Amino acid sequence: MEAICELYDPPAFEAGDKVQAIRAVRNDGTYPGIAMGQFLLEAGDVGYVKSVGTYLNRFYVYAIDFVDRGILVGMRRHELELLESAP
């Protein structure tokens, strides 16, 4: 079950953190230039937190820069694993 409001707690990740996608991610139609349903990421892809935002005043959304793929994808905490904290 989804948390009622993640915003009561601090973000799980900070700008500069190195993270890994836990599972493959498909375009839900919000990523421009790539067909809906097409894979954006594979499980294990590594990226860096560029910024932290919110969605619906309930959830943190992390802008992850997947440098090797050349894309910036908004992801939720349950889709990511911390590999290395920012210095």
Give the residues covered by each predicted segment.
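Basic/aromatic-rich interaction segments and small domains that mediate binding to polyanionic partners
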Residues: 2-87
